[in-house]
Amino acid sequence: APGWKSLPDEPGTADELLAEMDDHDVGWSVLVQTSWSTWDNGYIADSVQRFPDRFIGHGLIDPQDPNNAEVARYWMRERGLVGFRLHPMYYPDEAILVSPRNDALWEELAAADAVIQFHMRPSDAVQVDEIAAHFPHMKLLVDHMGYPDLEAEPAAYQPIVDLASRDNVFVKISDVAGRSTHPFPHVDVHPY
């Protein structure tokens, strides 16, 4: 996130995660650089290098960095990351994903078959749709269901639903409990 340099409230190491995975018979995990971090993906990359059979790494990439295509190439080729998370919702005054200054980035990511995750709101779906159409072989993931607003009309969420027409767009339902105001099974989120 632009200018956001906070740290997690609790420590969490790759070794701790690996122990939890072993305790619960989890074979492998995708490590994703936290969005409230810096652009340095070093810890994720180091963890993937230490445990290549257990971890896959996704980093952050700065969409405002004029050299982001080269940066992405470095993290993928030299450090072993396989994808990135981008945050269009942090740039409300700009269609940052489809800005011409990021054309080289998208070409680099597509050539590497990178998997891309998006922290986004429904208003950002038009950008993801454009990328999905231009790069139909790339896997694109909508994080946290696109943060549906349960107080808004369901039509406000329609841009996320419309992404279902793209074979290469997937939605992670990781925020059901976080969005819901009801106990499990969180029926207020079911329409989304």
Functional labels for PLM-detected ranges:
Residues 1-104, 108-112, 163, 179, ...:
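Mid-domain alpha/beta scaffold segments of enzyme catalytic cores
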Residues 82, 96-192:
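Catalytic pocket-lining loop regions of alpha/beta-barrel enzymes
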